[in-house]
């Protein structure tokens, strides 16, 4: 439990770092009106905050910067929302209430607006196809004696295909493989995508397929990739190109890493199934190669079966008091789409 004084100092460090983008020392805080403490007191509490894991030392200076624990505490307990953000709410209302847009168009345009208002990459997944779409058909189409096409069709009419080749094996024919896919089809048709992902990875399916072929892991991976692709097509991004124009994003290698992050399926795992406002600092996640970036996300629910997530990807020094109210407002009003 942090003392009131430590809370004030931690809040000041986070917001000073966000504003100046420089490691924070006690001398830079002593002039703040909310910190009526001596430089020695501030320095002592900053040392204690570092020992407790809320701050970390910057090796290139004597100052300190927030750790993920520090950001988490700040965002959960100390953040004061900047209600000047409400000046942008009518722009969000205009998008949400546009009667000419279907739901996915509303989400796409809202993400573009969120990018415009924050200047950071905005993204959305939704509505949640994994819990809203069922597999209606799986087709196996032989192309020749070594290659085939697997088509997976949902009850929403969405289609994904995967190519499969037997060039690496002589253990079965293409027609034997068709029989195996028929076994898988019988297990998956009629199931929600979320159920299908669990079934295809179950020991029962693995053991069943293993009776016929040795490359069952590769076959299962094809199905999982197809299921993930359904969600990928329902994922929207805005503001990726603008990042390259910012001074702090001028490192080409960094841009490549960010692009890889956005394209990887792991991003879906980060954003989906979160409750309430969630924040992930990239260098705390082994899934992401990028350091010093924060993903802020919040879910929305149009109804019980149409759920999604909106998010902002930006540097850890984002101006959270302005950005978080926009995310929260957009989430609330996307959840009212059926009422508009």
Curated annotation (Swiss-Prot):
Pfam families: HrcA. GO terms for biological process: negative regulation of DNA-templated transcription. It comes from the Bacteria. The keyword Protein biosynthesis does not apply. GO terms for molecular function: DNA binding. InterPro entries: GAF-like_dom_sf, HrcA, HrcA_C, WH-like_DNA-bd_sf, WH_DNA-bd_sf, WHTH_transcript_rep_HrcA_IDD. Keywords: Repressor, Stress response, Transcription, Transcription regulation. Negative regulator of class I heat shock genes (grpE-dnaK-dnaJ and groELS operons). Prevents heat-shock induction of these operons. HAMAP family: HrcA. NCBIfam families: hrcA. Belongs to the HrcA family. This is Heat-inducible transcription repressor HrcA. It comes from Phytoplasma australiense. The gene is hrcA.
């Amino acid at each position: 439990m942090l003392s009131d004084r430590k809370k004030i100092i931690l809040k000041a460090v986070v917001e000073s770092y966000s504003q100046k983008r420089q490691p924070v020392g006690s001398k830079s805080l002593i002039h703040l009106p909310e910190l009526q403490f001596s430089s020695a007191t501030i320095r002592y509490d900053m040392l204690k905050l570092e020992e407790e894991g809320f701050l970390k030392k910057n090796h290139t200076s004597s100052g300190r910067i927030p750790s993920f624990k520090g950001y988490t505490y700040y965002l959960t307990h100390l953040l004061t929302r900047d209600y000047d953000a409400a000046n942008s709410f009518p722009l969000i209302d205009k998008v949400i209430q546009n009667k000419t847009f279907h739901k996915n168009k509303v989400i796409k345009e809202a993400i573009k607006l969120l990018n415009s208002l924050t200047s950071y990459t905005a993204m959305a997944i939704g509505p949640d196809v994994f819990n809203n779409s069922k597999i209606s058909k799986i087709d196996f189409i032989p192309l020749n004696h070594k290659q085939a096409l697997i088509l997976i069709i949902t009850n929403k009419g969405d289609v994904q295909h995967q190519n499969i080749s037997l060039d690496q094996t002589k253990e079965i024919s293409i027609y034997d493989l068709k029989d195996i896919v028929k076994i898988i089809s019988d297990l998956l048709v009629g199931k929600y995508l979320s159920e299908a992902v669990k079934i295809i990875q179950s020991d029962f399916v693995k053991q069943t397929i293993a009776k016929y072929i040795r490359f069952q892991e590769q076959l299962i991976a094809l199905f999982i990739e197809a299921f993930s692709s359904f969600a990928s097509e329902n994922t929207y991004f805005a503001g990726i190109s603008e990042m390259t124009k910012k001074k702090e994003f001028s490192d080409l290698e960094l841009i490549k890493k960010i692009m890889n992050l956005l394209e990887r399926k792991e991003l879906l795992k980060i954003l989906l199934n979160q409750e309430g406002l969630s924040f992930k600092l990239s260098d705390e996640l082994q899934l992401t190669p990028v350091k010093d970036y924060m993903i802020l996300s919040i879910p929305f629910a149009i109804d019980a079966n149409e759920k999604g997530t909106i998010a902002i990807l930006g540097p850890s020094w984002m101006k959270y008091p302005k950005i978080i109210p926009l995310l929260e407002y957009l989430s609330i009003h996307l959840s009212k789409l059926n009422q508009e």
